[in-house]
Design a protein with these regions (language model features):
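The feature encodes the CheY-like receiver
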Residues: 16, 58, 76, 88, ...
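Conserved acidic carboxylate
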Residues: 10
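Acidic, metal-coordinating helix/loop segments flanking the phosphotransfer/catalytic sites
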Residues: 32-50
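Short, glycine/charged-rich "phosphate-handling" switch motifs in NTP-dependent
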Residues: 101
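Active-site residues of response regulator receiver
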Residues: 54, 84
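Charged docking surfaces used in two-component/phosphorelay signaling
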Residues: 17-25
């Protein structure tokens, strides 16, 4: 099986470490960025199978990043999962309207998170084995 490559964009170190650990525990190859600018720089040389991105990033928020990714032919096909601590009514719809393929709330529920990721990279998660 080919290891799927995921770009994790999260500015909070604790959340980044947790999400990175969960992804790596499922066999995914993970690259990490802490800002939108850093993510865009990485995407110049890398084409991940999935982007898992915090909505509240410094500088440019995750929804704006998702919109910009969908506008660029080189990145338009990369699914984005939005991760947010805000779960207000309509937030999921805003994320999907911005081009996100999925939406996960914090605190991250391991099973939900892994299933959402697996649904967008085409891998069966280890929790389903």
């Amino acid at each position: 099986m080919v290891r799927k490559n995921i770009l994790l964009v999260e500015d909070n170190e604790v959340n980044r470490r947790l999400a990175g650990f969960l992804l790596r525990s499922q066999g995914y190859q993970v690259r990490e960025a802490t800002t939108a600018l850093e993510a865009f720089e990485m995407l110049k040389n890398d084409h991940p199978d999935l982007i898992v991105m915090d909505i509240q990033l410094p500088g440019m928020d995750g929804l704006e990043v998702s919109r910009k990714l969908k506008e660029q032919p080189a990145t338009a096909d990369i699914p984005v999962i939005a991760v947010t601590s805000y779960a207000m009514k309509g937030d999921r719809e805003k994320a999907l309207a911005a081009g996100c393929a999925g939406y996960v709330t914090k605190p991250i529920d391991k099973t939900t998170f892994i299933q959402e990721v697996a649904a967008h990279v085409g891998n069966k998660s280890k929790t389903e084995d």
